[in-house]
């Protein structure tokens, strides 16, 4: 699908931006695809750029993603934690798997969802082929990743890690109200005014 172009006029000059570059001017990053290495590189680059522009000002990460690669998602997660700019997260559509972890990883009090979005958490999965010893190595790595992801989710939600481990054994779907109760988000927004009021509190 072609990327929309936005024309801005100032004085006698005009400037054309693709829509994502224009949103970046307002410190908005849109994660609207499955998460892979290429997507993670783009998101990380935008986070680092916006931090360099103003390390104290909020960055807004809008998430509509079914999840994807754990290692790619962790690159985004670690960058969010590394930079000094607070990262506000907002789920529109869905935040599933690694998308849900990134949603929960937003700055405290700045994690939101729109009213008809959905959130899903589960354990990492992987299929392996090859010699039995190689399969065993990969299986142990998946268990290590699973434990690490459970600890991260528990830290950001305030849930006991044992509950997170139980809940992620299978796909666990939540609406915004359930996600708020779980601790993945802090508020449900129906309009931009809600976000402004939350920031003012």
Swiss-Prot record:
Fourteen ClpP subunits assemble into 2 heptameric rings which stack back to back to give a disk-like structure with a central cavity, resembling the structure of eukaryotic proteasomes. PANTHER family: ATP-DEPENDENT CLP PROTEASE PROTEOLYTIC SUBUNIT, ATP-DEPENDENT CLP PROTEASE PROTEOLYTIC SUBUNIT, MITOCHONDRIAL. It is an enzyme of class 3 (hydrolase). The keyword Plastid does not apply. It is found in: Cytoplasm. The active site is at residues 97, 122. GO terms for biological process: protein quality control for misfolded or incompletely synthesized proteins. It comes from the Bacteria. Gene3D superfamilies: 2-enoyl-CoA Hydratase, Chain A, domain 1. One of its GO terms (cellular component) is cytoplasm. Its main location: cytoplasm. Belongs to the peptidase S14 family. It catalyses: Hydrolysis of proteins to small peptides in the presence of ATP and magnesium. alpha-casein is the usual test substrate. In the absence of ATP, only oligopeptides shorter than five residues are hydrolyzed (such as succinyl-Leu-Tyr-|-NHMec, and Leu-Tyr-Leu-|-Tyr-Trp, in which cleavage of the -Tyr-|-Leu- and -Tyr-|-Trp bonds also occurs). One of its GO terms (molecular function) is ATP-dependent peptidase activity. This is ATP-dependent Clp protease proteolytic subunit. Keywords: Cytoplasm, Hydrolase, Protease, Serine protease. Pfam families: CLP_protease. Its EC number is 3.4.21.92. Cleaves peptides in various proteins in a process that requires ATP hydrolysis. Has a chymotrypsin-like activity. Plays a major role in the degradation of misfolded proteins. InterPro entries: ClpP, ClpP/crotonase-like_dom_sf, ClpP/TepA, ClpP_His_AS, ClpP_Ser_AS. The keyword ATP-binding does not apply.
């Amino acid at each position: 699908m072609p990327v929309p172009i936005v024309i801005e006029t100032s004085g006698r000059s005009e400037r054309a931006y693709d829509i994502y570059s224009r949103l970046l001017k307002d410190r908005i990053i849109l994660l609207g695809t499955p998460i892979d290495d290429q997507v993670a590189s783009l998101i990380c680059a935008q986070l680092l750029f916006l931090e360099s522009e103003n390390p104290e000002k909020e960055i807004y990460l809008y998430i509509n993603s079914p999840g994807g690669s754990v290692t790619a998602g962790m690159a985004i997660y670690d960058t969010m934690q590394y930079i000094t700019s607070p990262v506000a997260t907002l789920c529109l559509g869905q935040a599933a798997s690694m998308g849900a972890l990134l949603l929960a990883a937003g700055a405290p009090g700045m994690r939101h969802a729109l009213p008809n979005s959905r959130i899903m958490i589960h354990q990492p999965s992987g299929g392996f082929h090859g010699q039995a010893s190689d399969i065993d190595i990969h299986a142990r790595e998946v268990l290590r990743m699973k434990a690490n992801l459970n600890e991260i989710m528990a830290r950001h939600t305030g849930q006991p890690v044992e509950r997170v481990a139980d809940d992620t054994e299978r796909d666990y779907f939540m609406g915004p109200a359930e996600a708020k109760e779980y601790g993945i988000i802090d508020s449900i927004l129906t309009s931009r005014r809600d976000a402004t009021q939350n920031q003012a509190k």
